[in-house]
Amino acid sequence: MGSSKLLVAFTLIVMMTISYDLFTGIGIDARTVPPTCYESCNATFQNPECNKMCVGLAYKDGSCIYPPPEVDGLPPKRPYFPRCCCNPIILSPPSP
């Protein structure tokens, strides 16, 4: 019985620690995601919706593409889908 109480207490402490925002108390209100596609961008590609789609994609001819051009030297199985150029993205913290 004592070990089950200890397990429940430990689980609650872990859950509270994970859900508690540690950075709020020190004034960090946003995080910056570095761009993955940024060379030769033009104004038509620079908007928040494009930036959201572009993170993590490959870059080619002024835009992001999916899938990446080659994986381990093999050509892609699917056609390229051009995406938008990226600027650094400022993400606001999740709302409570």
Swiss-Prot record:
Where on the tree of life does the source sit, at the highest rank?
A: Eukaryota
Q: Which cysteines are joined by disulfide bonds?
A: C37-C86, C41-C64, C50-C84, C54-C85
Sorted alphabetically, the Gene Ontology cellular component annotations on this record are:
extracellular region
Predominant location category:
secreted
User: Which GO terms of type biological process are on file?
Assistant: defense response to fungus; killing of cells of another organism
Keywords (alphabetical) are:
Antimicrobial, Disulfide bond, Fungicide, Plant defense, Secreted, Signal
Against Pfam families, the record matches this protein to: Defensin
Q: Where in the cell is it found?
A: Secreted
- What's the name of the protein? Defensin-like protein 69
Q: Which organism is it from?
A: Arabidopsis thaliana
Lineage of the source organism?
Answer: Eukaryota, Viridiplantae, Streptophyta, Embryophyta, Tracheophyta
